[in-house]
Design a protein with these regions (language model features):
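Basic, amphipathic "hinge/linker" alpha-helix immediately C-terminal to the N-terminal HTH DNA-binding motif
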Residues: 84-102
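Beta-hairpin "wing" of winged helix-turn-helix
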Residues: 70-84, 89
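Short, surface-exposed helix/turn micro-motifs that flank interaction/cofactor sites
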Residues: 44-45, 68, 89, 95
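N-terminal helix-turn-helix DNA-binding core of bacterial DNA-binding proteins
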Residues: 17-59
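Short, charged/polar surface micro-motifs in flexible loops or helix N-caps
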Residues: 35-39, 69-70, 93-94
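Short, Lys/Arg-enriched N-terminal segment that forms or immediately precedes the first helix
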Residues: 2-18
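Short, hydrophobic-biased segments on the C-terminal half of alpha helices
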Residues: 61-69
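Amphipathic alpha-helical dimerization/coiled-coil segments
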Residues: 96-119
Protein backbone atom coordinates (compact mmCIF):
# COMPACT_ATOMS: atom_id res chain seq x y z
CA UNK A 1 0.00 0.00 0.00
CA UNK A 2 1.53 3.33 -1.01
CA UNK A 3 1.33 6.30 1.28
CA UNK A 4 1.10 9.90 0.25
CA UNK A 5 3.97 11.89 1.71
CA UNK A 6 2.74 15.07 3.35
CA UNK A 7 4.94 18.00 4.22
CA UNK A 8 3.87 18.25 7.86
CA UNK A 9 6.21 21.15 8.56
CA UNK A 10 4.41 23.19 5.91
CA UNK A 11 0.98 22.14 7.19
CA UNK A 12 1.92 22.88 10.79
CA UNK A 13 3.39 26.27 9.91
CA UNK A 14 0.39 27.27 7.82
CA UNK A 15 -2.00 25.98 10.48
CA UNK A 16 -0.34 27.99 13.22
CA UNK A 17 -0.19 31.09 11.03
CA UNK A 18 -3.86 30.79 10.06
CA UNK A 19 -4.93 30.21 13.67
CA UNK A 20 -2.89 33.19 14.84
CA UNK A 21 -4.39 35.49 12.21
CA UNK A 22 -7.92 34.23 12.89
CA UNK A 23 -7.45 34.91 16.58
CA UNK A 24 -5.78 38.30 16.31
CA UNK A 25 -7.82 39.74 13.39
CA UNK A 26 -10.89 40.74 15.47
CA UNK A 27 -8.66 42.41 18.06
CA UNK A 28 -6.89 44.34 15.30
CA UNK A 29 -10.21 45.46 13.83
CA UNK A 30 -11.32 46.64 17.27
CA UNK A 31 -8.01 48.45 17.75
CA UNK A 32 -8.42 50.18 14.40
CA UNK A 33 -12.00 51.20 15.17
CA UNK A 34 -10.93 52.49 18.59
CA UNK A 35 -8.84 55.07 16.72
CA UNK A 36 -11.20 55.94 13.87
CA UNK A 37 -14.47 55.08 12.18
CA UNK A 38 -14.05 53.14 8.92
CA UNK A 39 -15.97 51.94 5.92
CA UNK A 40 -15.82 48.17 5.51
CA UNK A 41 -13.74 48.57 2.36
CA UNK A 42 -11.06 50.52 4.28
CA UNK A 43 -10.61 47.99 7.07
CA UNK A 44 -8.39 45.39 5.29
CA UNK A 45 -5.95 48.01 3.98
CA UNK A 46 -5.71 49.82 7.30
CA UNK A 47 -5.14 46.58 9.26
CA UNK A 48 -2.45 45.58 6.77
CA UNK A 49 -0.80 48.99 7.24
CA UNK A 50 -1.05 48.71 11.04
CA UNK A 51 0.75 45.36 10.96
CA UNK A 52 3.33 46.27 8.30
CA UNK A 53 1.76 43.71 5.99
CA UNK A 54 1.85 40.81 8.47
CA UNK A 55 -1.94 40.46 8.66
CA UNK A 56 -4.11 40.59 5.57
CA UNK A 57 -7.86 40.38 6.14
CA UNK A 58 -9.68 38.46 3.45
CA UNK A 59 -13.14 38.51 4.99
CA UNK A 60 -13.74 41.77 6.85
CA UNK A 61 -17.52 41.29 6.54
CA UNK A 62 -17.34 38.03 8.50
CA UNK A 63 -15.23 39.58 11.25
CA UNK A 64 -17.38 42.72 11.45
CA UNK A 65 -20.62 40.72 11.46
CA UNK A 66 -19.35 38.65 14.41
CA UNK A 67 -18.15 41.74 16.29
CA UNK A 68 -21.43 43.54 15.59
CA UNK A 69 -23.58 40.59 16.70
CA UNK A 70 -21.69 40.62 20.01
CA UNK A 71 -22.30 44.34 20.46
CA UNK A 72 -18.61 45.23 20.15
CA UNK A 73 -19.04 47.44 17.09
CA UNK A 74 -21.93 49.37 15.57
CA UNK A 75 -22.77 50.80 12.18
CA UNK A 76 -23.84 54.34 11.36
CA UNK A 77 -25.44 55.31 8.08
CA UNK A 78 -23.70 58.15 6.34
CA UNK A 79 -24.45 59.98 3.12
CA UNK A 80 -21.35 60.21 0.93
CA UNK A 81 -21.33 61.31 -2.70
CA UNK A 82 -25.11 61.05 -2.75
CA UNK A 83 -25.01 57.43 -1.58
CA UNK A 84 -25.90 55.96 1.77
CA UNK A 85 -22.84 54.18 3.18
CA UNK A 86 -22.23 52.26 6.36
CA UNK A 87 -19.42 53.36 8.61
CA UNK A 88 -18.22 51.08 11.41
CA UNK A 89 -17.35 52.28 14.91
CA UNK A 90 -16.44 50.65 18.20
CA UNK A 91 -18.94 50.62 21.08
CA UNK A 92 -18.28 51.12 24.79
CA UNK A 93 -18.61 47.36 25.23
CA UNK A 94 -16.08 46.96 22.42
CA UNK A 95 -13.65 49.34 24.11
CA UNK A 96 -13.93 47.41 27.39
CA UNK A 97 -13.43 44.12 25.57
CA UNK A 98 -10.43 45.54 23.67
CA UNK A 99 -8.76 46.74 26.88
CA UNK A 100 -9.25 43.35 28.51
CA UNK A 101 -8.13 41.33 25.49
CA UNK A 102 -5.18 43.63 24.74
CA UNK A 103 -3.77 43.11 28.22
CA UNK A 104 -4.29 39.36 27.97
CA UNK A 105 -2.79 39.21 24.47
CA UNK A 106 0.29 41.26 25.43
CA UNK A 107 0.85 39.05 28.47
CA UNK A 108 0.58 35.89 26.37
CA UNK A 109 2.87 37.17 23.59
CA UNK A 110 5.47 38.34 26.11
CA UNK A 111 5.39 34.99 27.90
CA UNK A 112 5.87 33.05 24.66
CA UNK A 113 8.62 35.45 23.52
CA UNK A 114 10.43 34.88 26.83
CA UNK A 115 10.49 31.15 26.13
CA UNK A 116 12.26 31.77 22.82
CA UNK A 117 14.71 34.24 24.36
CA UNK A 118 15.89 31.54 26.79
CA UNK A 119 17.91 29.79 24.07
Amino acid sequence: MSRIQVDTDYELTKGIEMLFKKTVAPILVLRLLSKQKCYITEIPKKVEEMTDGAVKLCLPYTICTRLRSNGLIAVDAELKDGRKRQIYKITEKGLDFLRQQSASYINCVNSVAAVFREE
